[in-house]
């Protein structure tokens, strides 16, 4: 069916500039610009047209709001306190103690996860996924690396999977020092505590699609546990449509005392790695200006849209990078496996409290100590993860085979995709933005069709297509390639 949006000229809403946005989703303050000029306004679809309406972020429904309210800062504090009590959780630490070391922590996490799963009426299962890592970088002797995974099986589309992880291993200054205490309260007991709290909440609320909540190991030695998890999922052809990595999400205070307790950064890679995208497609992406519309960045935009609101009390600041300088994270292995993945990290880091021997020098306390963790902030980050995961799982799957016609030299845009046979899909939306805008700014519901012709030049805007469920939830947008 052909849908011509020009017929909807009565739905004109002019685009908003910086002073009109509903809430801020970027970390830096906006740079002053001429608000009267559509060419300078990042939130404008230039040139102005009478197509579509201004995009309004997806609000949480009553069920999601109630779930978000279940996230407990007290539970997160108790979990971090317990993880710190194991002394060190270094990947190479003692294996034969029930009170100290990585295995003691693993067993406790698994025990707690199983308690949560017992409340799920069989919809949540817990697995300890282990393998023996031979001698390798930062691994001087063979060691068992274990991931604790709680899987909430989807009620309607269980083959579609979303993953969230935090890593439970820790370290001090010397990455091979597995004897000294390494509390790892922020890095990354905070992310592990969020994964566990999400498991507790989701055990009582079955999602439509499957959600895996993981406490992974071997991160500090080289992302071993998460890479193994990603490759295992890839080797079994698991359809992972999104992965969230929570790492260093426990403090709102930076090393200069600056505080930003209501913002979380979301790191999102640009062009996918060559292991996930062919060289031909990578070249095409650059040719058509799609370097800012990788699956990872669409996932980050989705998180900013559904999780930055008054239910979570947070803003999501998208950072257009794989990760911070000189650092890496557990989302990397998922990206290399071809899965969309992003990393959440606190807005202002204090490096005296990361990867440090516990000590005091010149009045400065070093070490990843629990006294530096903001439990309310960590709980709010958990709410961002919950809102994102639940909104992903309740929405229809992303549209498939989305293409734009690049064979005709004109000022219309022809986009097509495969219509889903799912009864949950109510319609599709075209979203778009200026090429200099970070987030989608405009949308047009085109019904349950698989082809649309828009009186907007593909040269001037960036398009995406997303599926809309009968329940109101919307999928992440898919960027169209020529086809």
From Swiss-Prot:
Glycans are attached at residues 96, 121, 235, 310, 362, 401, 411, 421. Its cofactor is Zn(2+). GO terms for cellular component: extracellular region. This is Probable zinc metalloprotease PTRG_04977. Gene3D superfamilies: Zn peptidases. It is found in: Secreted. Its main location: secreted. One of its GO terms (biological process) is proteolysis. Binds 2 Zn(2+) ions per subunit. Its EC number is 3.4.-.-.
